Amino acid sequence: MTRLEGRVALVTGAGRYRGIGRAIVLRLAEEGADVVVTARARDASSFPPHEQEMGWKGIESVAEEVRGMGRRALAVDCDVTDKDDLQRTVDAAVAELGGIDILVNNAALPSEAGAAPILEMTDENWYETVDVNLHGLYHTIRAVGREMVKGGGGSIINISSTAGRIGIPNYGAYCATKWAMHGLTQQLALELARQNIRVNIVCPGSTDTDMMDGTFGRYDEVAGQEPGTSKAAIRRALLMGRQATVEEQAAVVAFLASDDSSYMTGQALNVDGGSRMD
C-alpha cells in the first residue's frame, strides 16, 4: 500500500525495539511516508538485555530500517519537554524532508514510573510525569502544528491508553495525563478543523511491549508475586485471550494518518481487544 506516498511523518518516542513507536514508524514507511524518528537519548547501558545483545542503536537503528525500505528517514535526539529541542527537530524535518504532514505523539513516561497512591507519591514523580506526558504533548503539537498550518493541513495522532478512559489504582499521575490528552485532543480538533488538520487518539489496551512488561514487573514486585504472574493473569482475563501486538496498534495509526479517515477528527479509538466498548 502507498496511501501515504509523498508525506512526511514525525513520530516521537520511537527508539525501543519492542515498542509501539517503532512499529508505527515502520508501518507509515511501508505505506509510503518518509519519517522523522525521534526519542530522548538513552545510554546504551540502560537498554533491555535483548537490545544490547543485538547492538541496538535506538532511533538510528529505526531510521536505518526505514531507509532499507526505500524511504527517507531522519533520526533526531529530541526531548519533548525542551521547546528548543522540538523547534530544532521541526526545522530539520522541514529542511531535509520538506515539511511535516503527520504527527504521532507517542513519547511518554511509562505507567510504572512513580507508581504510588496519590497521597503517597512524591511531588517529583507527579511533576515529571506531567512534564513529559502532558507538557511534552502540548509543546510538540504547538511546534509541529504551526508548520502544518503553513503546509495546508495534516493529521495529528495522539497515543493515549485505556488508562485515559478509566482510573487505575496507584497510577494517578499517568491516568491524569492521559485523561488530559483526551480533553486537549478535542479542543485542538475544534480549533484546527478549518485549517485542514485532523486530531485523533489511539487508546492501546494491554500490548506486548517492553514498557508493558515493566508495568507487569512492578505489579508482581508490589504484590510479592513470582515474575510473570501478572502478565499471565492479564492474558487469561483479556476477551481475546492475548495481548495486542505492536503491529495491530500501528495499523490503526496508519488509518488515522491516511485519507481513509478524512472525515474523522476529535475521536478516540480503543485498540484493546474489546476490553472497553465505549
Model-found features: residue ranges?
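Canonical Rossmann dinucleotide-binding motif of NAD(H)/NADP(H)-dependent dehydrogenases/reductases
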Residues: 3-42
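The beta1-alpha1 cofactor-binding region of Rossmann-like NAD(H)/NADP(H)-dependent oxidoreductases
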Residues: 56-57, 77-89, 123, 246-248
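Substrate-binding pocket helix/loop in short-chain dehydrogenase/reductase
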Residues: 114-118, 122-130, 234
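Short C-terminal tail/terminal secondary-structure segment
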Residues: 115, 166, 236-242, 253-254, ...
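Active-site helix of classical SDR
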Residues: 141, 177, 185
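Residue(s) in the substrate-gating loop at a strand-loop-helix junction
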Residues: 161
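Short, small/polar-rich loop/turn modules that mediate ligand/substrate recognition or access, typified
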Residues: 193, 198, 264-266
